[in-house]
Amino acid sequence: RTDKHIIEQICEHYKIENPDLRCEMYFSEDERRLSEQLSSQLEEDFIVIEPHSKDNYTPNRAYPFANWQKLVDKLGKNIQVVQVGLSNSPVLDHVVDFRGKTSFRSATLLIEKARLLMSTEGGLVHAATAVDTTSLVVITGYQTVKMVAYPQNINVYIGSHGPCGLKIPCLDCKRDSAKHNYEEIHEKVVDFLT
């Protein structure tokens, strides 16, 4: 179904009407203490980026790594950019490299302290809603905005088709991502940060 947000769809099954479109996570004092140690290495103002889309389910949510790099090159002149993710994923230039230094939960606590998370639709975007941090989310034609976008986020829909819902590579999703002008994202981030 693509007519409602996924949270609304799940709540509908349990007869819960008008749920808040946000997730909930709860953290221990130890988790918060470790997060403080990690974030103490950073400037007061920073943004978090996860440029890699988990592709073992579908490759069709990905946004070009080169475009993420262009964004970091421009944004990094005015604000610190911290990259999270798996230790074996490619690292962007000009970022604070926290790949492999955080779990999903500790990355969420780092995002809590950030001004913004930049990513494609995925787990960290959902987690950011639990800690009240706005995300800039790139959404491809793989899925509909209505199903995955949170109203508190900056949602950039780049699809010209769909939702395809394909788990195999979609040529339309790939083409849309390749031709998207990253400047649209840059302008939205600058507007948000100023």
Indicate residue ranges for each PLM-predicted region:
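Catalytic machinery of carbohydrate-active enzymes
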Residues: 1-194
